[in-house]
Amino acid sequence: MEILFFGSKGPITKLLQKTLNRIGYNAGEADGIFGEQTYEAVIQFQQSNQIPPTGIVWPQTWDALAPALLGYSKYTVQAGDTLFKIAEENDISVRALTAANPGVQPDSLEIGTVLTVPSDRSVIDWDIEYCYDIMYLNLRALKIRYPFIEIFSAGRSAMNQEIYGARLGRGDINVLYNASHH
């Protein structure tokens, strides 16, 4: 992800603003312009997450924002937990919870097991201009919700960016959807 700072503009800045607002840090209107209110929200987020409060969104800040950006949280199984209870407390379906945690046995949850809890919001944020970085975040978010998806490199573009593919299953029939755009 690109490094953002006071004065940055564009879809990644808008995504940052929407994410900060969603998790309780008032970045103001999500207009794609990194102004004073966004700067203050970034400082507050950094302080809350033991990151040096520079107001610059650099890799350490992006890493701390990853669960909110990608739409998941982690939950450690406690005594008395069931998948139904965990799903209900997080306002998601048991199906979504089991899809994100293949191999977890619903009838015998082990205390201390760390589960991925997907959020109920859409992976795609429809009111942000689509760009390469957002496409990559969307692929990562899908992989978290559906670990069976295989993300792979199909090569590099003329602009030297990775061209990603996603395999959703295996079988006798192969279907290719091309979503390239310039």
Identify the residue ranges that each predicted region occupies.
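M14 metallocarboxypeptidase catalytic domain recognition
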Residues: 69-80, 84-106, 110-182
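Acidic, Ser/Thr/Pro/Gly-enriched interdomain connector segments
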Residues: 1-32, 68, 75-78
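Alpha-helical interaction/regulatory segments in DNA maintenance proteins
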Residues: 53-69
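Short, conserved phosphate/pyrophosphate- and ester-handling motifs at nucleotide-, phospho-/glycolipid
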Residues: 35, 58, 160
